[in-house]
Amino acid sequence: MKITVEDIIKDLELEVLVQGEKDKEIKTSDINRPGLQFAGFYSYFANSRVQVIGNAEWSFLKNMPVELIRKRMKKFFEFDTPCIIIARDLEPHPQLIKNAKLHKRWVLRSKLLTTKVVTKLMNYLDAKLAPETRMHGVLVDVYGIGMLITGESGIGKSETALELIKRGHRLVADDAVDIKEIDGVLRGTSPYITSGMLEVRGMGIIDIPALYGLSSVLQKKTIHLVIYLEQWKPDRNYDRLGIDDDFLEILNVPVKKLTVPIRPGRNLAVIIEAAAANYRYGLMCKVSPVETINNRMESMVRNESKR
C-alpha cells in the first residue's frame, strides 16, 4: 500500500509548517532521530526514514553557534527525506525552515511528546505498509480464537459461520478476507463494502449486526487456525488422532490447518467450536490428548507386566 506524507498529515493530525513535494511517498516504518546528523556525522544517515526532532535535537540546535547551524542545516537538507516531524509543539529554528523551503521538504509539527510521536507513527506505518493479501473464506472469532474457514465455493462456509454466530460467536469477514502480516502475526479484516454482511445461498445477503446485534461482529482478528472444509473422500485417510500437524503458509507465516470432511450428519459448528477449545487447551497445557492416551497405555502395560 502506498503511503504519502499527505496521508500521515490527515490521519495523525499533524500541523504543516512547510509544504514539500506533492505525493511524497514514505517507504519504511522505521524512524530516525537526526541528532548525530546535526552534530555533523554522515557516515551513516537513514535519510529514507521519517525524521523526528524532539527536545534533545531541538536543544542541541538552540545552543549551537549561528554560523554552524547554517552549515549543518545546509548539509542536512542536501539529503532527500520524506518529511521532518517536530514533536512537543516546539518552535523550529529559522535555518531549518529556510532550507526546507529551499529544497521543498515537508516540515510538520505535533503537540505530542517525542516518544508518543515515534510510537504512534511507527504503529501507523507498520499497519499501513505491512504485506497483505486477500483470501476467499470466512473469518470468525470462536472463544477468542481467530478461525479462517476455507474450502471450495458452495461447500457451506457461510452457513457454518451463521450457525456459529447464532451460538454467540462473532463474524469478522465473509467471502473475502483481507490479511496483513505484522511482526509475524496475521490479522484479518473485512473489505469495507462487505463489512458486517454474510451471504447465504438461497437467502441472499444478511446484515449480521442488524439481526444479531453489534456484539456479533468484530472489525479485525488475529488468525490462529485455518479450517479447510471438503467433501468426504472415501479413498482418503483422514487424521483421526491429531498426530500429524498440517500448516498453511500465508504471507510466509505458517498457520495450523485442520481439514474437516463434510458428509450428512456432521455438525460443523460444533466441530469448529471443539477445534477452537482444543487450540486454547493446547496453549495452556503442554500435554496433548494423544500424549495422555499414550501415557495411559504405557502405564497399563507397566502394570500388566508387574503381575
Curated annotation (Swiss-Prot):
Record's catalysed reaction(s): [HPr protein]-L-serine + ATP = [HPr protein]-O-phospho-L-serine + ADP + H(+); [HPr protein]-O-phospho-L-serine + phosphate + H(+) = [HPr protein]-L-serine + diphosphate
Enzyme nomenclature, EC number: 2.7.11.-, 2.7.4.-
Source domain of life: Bacteria
Gene Ontology biological-process entries: regulation of carbohydrate metabolic process
Residues holding ATP: G151, E152, S153, G154, I155, G156, K157, S158
Binding site for Mg(2+): S158, E199
Record GO terms (molecular function): ATP binding; magnesium ion binding; phosphorelay sensor kinase activity; protein serine/threonine kinase activity; protein serine/threonine/tyrosine kinase activity
Residues covered by region (Important for the catalytic mechanism of both phosphorylation and dephosphorylation): 198-207
Enzyme class: transferase
Keyword Cytoplasm: no
Tagged with keyword Isomerase: no
Alphabetical list of CDD domains matching this protein: HprK_C
InterPro entries with a match to the protein in the record: HPr(Ser)_kin/Pase, Hpr_kin/Pase_C, Hpr_kin/Pase_Hpr_N, P-loop_NTPase, Ser_kin/Pase_Hpr-like_N_sf
Active site: H136, K157, D175 (proton acceptor), R240
Region (Important for the catalytic mechanism of dephosphorylation): 261-266
Keywords in alphabetical order: ATP-binding, Carbohydrate metabolism, Kinase, Magnesium, Metal-binding, Multifunctional enzyme, Nucleotide-binding, Serine/threonine-protein kinase, Transferase
Required cofactor(s): Mg(2+)
Domain notes: The Walker A ATP-binding motif also binds Pi and PPi.
Subunit and interaction comment: Homohexamer.
Reported function: Catalyzes the ATP- as well as the pyrophosphate-dependent phosphorylation of a specific serine residue in HPr, a phosphocarrier protein of the phosphoenolpyruvate-dependent sugar phosphotransferase system (PTS). HprK/P also catalyzes the pyrophosphate-producing, inorganic phosphate-dependent dephosphorylation (phosphorolysis) of seryl-phosphorylated HPr (P-Ser-HPr).
Record-stated family: Belongs to the HPrK/P family.
Comment field (misc): Both phosphorylation and phosphorolysis are carried out by the same active site and suggest a common mechanism for both reactions.
Name under which the protein is recorded: HPr kinase/phosphorylase
Source species: Clostridium novyi (strain NT)
